[in-house]
Amino acid sequence: MAIRNVNLWQSIDWLTIILYLVLVTFGWLSICSATYDFGELTELDLLSFDTNTGKQLAWIGCAMIIALILLGVEKKYYEMLAYPIYFAFVVVLAVTIFVAPDIKGSHSWLVVGPIRIQPAEFSKFATSLALARLLSTYGFSMAKRTDIAKMIAIVIVPMLLIVLQNETGSALVYLSFFLVLYREGMTGSLLAVGVCAVLYFVIGVGQSGNFLESMPMVCVGEFIVFLLIPLFTALMVGIYGKRLSHALWIAGGNLTGTFLAWLFSRYVVPFDICIVQLILCACTALYLLYMYILERYASYLLIALFALGSVGFYYSCNMIIDKLQPHQQMRILVLLGIKDDPSGVGYNINQSKIAIGSGGLWGKGFLNGTQTKLNYVPEQHTDFIFCTIGEEQGFVGCTFILLLYAFFIIRIIMLAERQGSNKFTRVYGYCLASILTFHLFVNVGMVIGLAPVIGIPLPFFSYGGSSLWGFTILLSILLRLDAERDSHYR
């Protein structure tokens, strides 16, 4: 194998760099809009280090320096140091739990003099490197249980440590890594299980306070979830178990049993028919375990565990809600429509909607947003900065920014796909694309009321050095890896 030197100036993807610089520039201008005050600040004050805009400008300058340094590091060092970097950040995340001060109920910030750093933002690139290194290792296979266990552990360990820091929003970002695994050949069954879990949670928690009119003792959420579990189980038996007849028996048996229980409760003796549904789910799992013993077909065992796990997950949903911070509980309950609190936790979302709606088609103009200038929207320069864009630039401006993000993410995916046999860079590229997509969807979703407010920043726009540096590091490493895509040839 011959190796040729890389001409970074010619090999680097300049289009991606231009898109990055455009996003960072628009982000800084949005922070100017969100923090500018007609009565107190002048245009020159925006450049002062005493203001958020001046500080953000300093973070941007430091980000450029970090990018230049990382672009000078050869690919072989990223591959060689992937695991050490990952384990180092795992240690830092663990230490942060104990040494970080309590800031708004979270122990996720390390304070060094006047500077506050959030390790969770930097652990994303460490996890991306480790995942890319593992999946590109010779002999790695999605069919090996040990490899799957290692793969899941790399994602779950930092995620759990961040949860222990009471930073649930940042921890949820790590779920985006499973999209990368799906691209690399992971079976779609895990994604299907994830979708089922979301449905169980939304329906179970969202309808937990409602009861059937004809049977007041039957909880609507519990009834629907216990109806879905055997149906999803039957669907999996038909798809993965390759036994359509067994799938029809499972679905038909559960529906018939539930219907008979409803008739008995409605016209004979009233009782909670969810008890019968629970028994039917247990019988379904036992039947699948019996078929596994009889035929030694592993899919039956896994589907039986899915059925039992679904029941356990449903009952654990309320326990999970109880473990969250009170303000996080209220945000989820408001999002699911269980409670209405327009002057409390729902205040941010309501004011954000008002700000975006008041922008109309073309917006009120740069620095002319009244909702933002009068500070109606809390955290308008950080998590809710998108409402500033909506108010001042209108629907057209919001659409332009979203299209810019879409183009940027698609470009990153293109960089990942053009790597050929270079699996390390491809996996890393998809890690970055998945993280960006998750941040974009959740942040914009929570600003317009479609997602819970969980404190996830908008990449390159939200105020703060940790987020900007974290994404700059992620992108800089990808650009260097991509620049070396043709440096090795046989």
For each of these PLM feature ranges, what is it?
Residues 387, 398, 430-431, 459, ...:
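Pore-lining and gate-forming transmembrane alpha-helices of multi-pass membrane transport proteins
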Residues 231-234, 449-486, 490:
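Transmembrane alpha-helices of multi-pass inner-membrane enzymes
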